[in-house]
Amino acid sequence: MLLGGALLLRLVLALVTDGYPYDMSCFVAWGDKLAAEGPAAFYSEGYFADYPPGYLWVLGLVGAIRAALHIAYESKWTYFLLALVPSLCDCGLAWLVYRTAKRSSRGVKEHTALVLTAFTAFNPLMLFDTGVWKQIDGAFALPLVLCFVLLEQRRYLPAAVLYGVALAIKPQALLFGPVLAVCYLAAITLEKDRLRAFGRCFGGAALALLPPLLTGLPFFGVVQLIPKLIDKYTGTMSGYPYATINAFNWLAALGGNWKGQADPALFGISWQQLGCLNILLVTAGLAYFAVRSVRGGWFSPLLLAAYYGIGIFTLAHCMHERYMVPGVLLTLLAAAHWNDIRLYAAGVGLSLTGFINLATVYSQTGTSDEWLTSATSSTVAVLTGLGETVCFVLLIFAVWDIARHGHTLALPETKPETAPPVPAPQPKWTRRELGA
């Protein structure tokens, strides 16, 4: 019932709102082109399509359904069809949170598991992203998050396949590549059969490449498959040379929104140099936490992925507003796994700052303040960026404590209310005493 209500709410929002216009026009146009011309003619010369082939198959199916039923672009049912798959994936993510909490060895109570599941199902960030904005981040995040859930269970090869599925959908999966590499390297030290674990690294890499290759083959053919895929992924990742692209993070708090990455930032260095330095620091932190947690027996792919995903969003350059979505969901999954109040707080805080971020960008689209240059929008960006950074710092404290010491801060237990004492039985009055 909980997940059914969450699905219904998303689909109702999809019907009564217009969606982010730039994404909507791309999704509809791509789906129509793929349905009409087929995959081999899709990436034609001069045609803008910055998505890899993975999710284009879903958009093509939407285009085919619209053509068969004569559904116009302006129809609300077009938005409904576009939001259907991501909405189902959002509900799958909420169910995954519940299953993770129930399987936790940290004593997550049924009430806590249900509350966390309800928050994930009705998360304001995900409701807005899927139901109003109508992006596909839920469909991208589900295989990516499930990959790290499987890594938590040491199911390395299925995890590699799911990472490949996420990579086939969006290039942003590459941001989590270092975490995947750390998990496979840690397996070499965690298992007795190190030769087998070492071979599994190569097997996992091959399996991770399989979904992008298979989904891209009809688009590019055998000869051009690998060169075209490399060009598609590198071109997409480098297509927005700005300090931050409406991402309310630490760089936005410093005034970097829509600033060219070559512009000066702090102490004479450019935004790009600052972002690269921050990426190195976050990656060094990932390596440190991984080594310490392996030695202590507290290695957790979910925890490391949450740290790295939010760390890159907070401190790196070229970030979009929605790049935080997988990191937020991973933080909620890590909270369900570790039952740590700091992780719960970070997940809730990041969800709220992400919602404010998306709502601000969406509300100003098509207005004179679309680039968020007004005093009000700039202030919102700075304050929200500071709030998001505070949530990341809280996340770091939790990761530091768990990775180094295996120490968690559980939710305070509420003592059950004790019933008032039953009064002692009173002596019965006799008729003689009553008449006295």
Language-model features: locations:
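Transmembrane signal-anchor helices characteristic of membrane glycosylation enzymes that use polyprenol
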Residues: 1-29, 37, 83, 87-90, ...
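Specific aromatic-rich, kink-prone transmembrane helix
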Residues: 96-99, 139-156, 330-331
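Transmembrane helical bundles and short interhelical boundary loops of multi-pass, membrane-embedded
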Residues: 200, 224, 229-245, 251, ...
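Extracytosolic helix-loop segments that constitute the early lumenal/periplasmic catalytic or substrate-binding loops
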Residues: 23-50, 54, 61-72, 224-232
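Perimembrane helix-loop-helix junctions
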Residues: 176-210, 222, 326
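Membrane-interface alpha helices of multi-pass inner-membrane proteins
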Residues: 117, 128, 144-150, 157-181, ...
